[in-house]
Amino acid sequence: MKRRQFIKRSSAATVPVLLGGVQVSAINHSFFNILNSESDRVLVLIQLDGGNDGLNMLIPKDQYSNLMKARPNIIIPENSILDLTDTLGLHPVMQDLKTVFDDGKLNIIQSVSYPNQNRSHFRSTDIWNTASSATENLTTGWLGRYLETLYPDYPTAYPNAAFPDPFAITIGTAVSPTCEGTTANYSTALVNPDNISALAVPINGDLPDSCFGEQIDFLAQSIIQTNAYNDSIQTANNKGNNISTKYADDNELANKLKIVAKLIAGGLQTKIYIVRLGGFDNHAEQVEANDTSTGKHAELLNELSTAICAF
């Protein structure tokens, strides 16, 4: 039974799914050349959960007087900003990321936003994942919609000889909504490639000719697909190695990026990886009163900076 048929019959799919939002044609085509199986380019998305204070991370130095008026209790001291350009600087704990910038390996895109911003963490995350406008609600992710244009029959008959590896991998316990398609998520969740166990297929004898039997068959096929992807992930993990010695054991994000680096080095053909760093909903703990360049936000930015540099 095809997954599309199952979804149509399932009571959980009574709400229609829309494919609106940002059109694929509106996105620079070269951005998606990484999905070409003949290319060795890989897209790694790092999602900062909780609402990162971008103005204290990437600081517009030419607007410092205005920032001082708007946020005097949390603004970074002007003399501690790490200069990138004449008008732009980084938080002082992000020296590693500045080194990446100075080496010509970091580009910055500013003013990425949308009209009528929503101040809710939850709704803003939905908009980020789906690339919807502030006035529409979508149930498909922006990467999922694009992947669906290329592989509309997924997950039926996947993996196969042409595409033996997952299209996307989310490092964590749950797949990323960014990769959600109409009837399937194109991402595979992975916690630890060193500790993968095959899932038991829930079939014992013939299945009844009923909706229940169809659902069990669908579940079984999903588990078979997961086990097949896990096999390819384990193979790449066993072959991979990490040249960098900068991955700190006490850095959560670095450990996730280390997994990504190892799978890439091991030859896994997955083109998209999603990793997340949480804790950015800092509120009063964002900065220390006696030194605004320290505090919870500074700790997270340091973790982000050192992890990216190691990767």
PLM region spans:
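Feature for exported/extracytoplasmic and membrane-associated proteins, marking the mature portion
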Residues: 2-306, 310
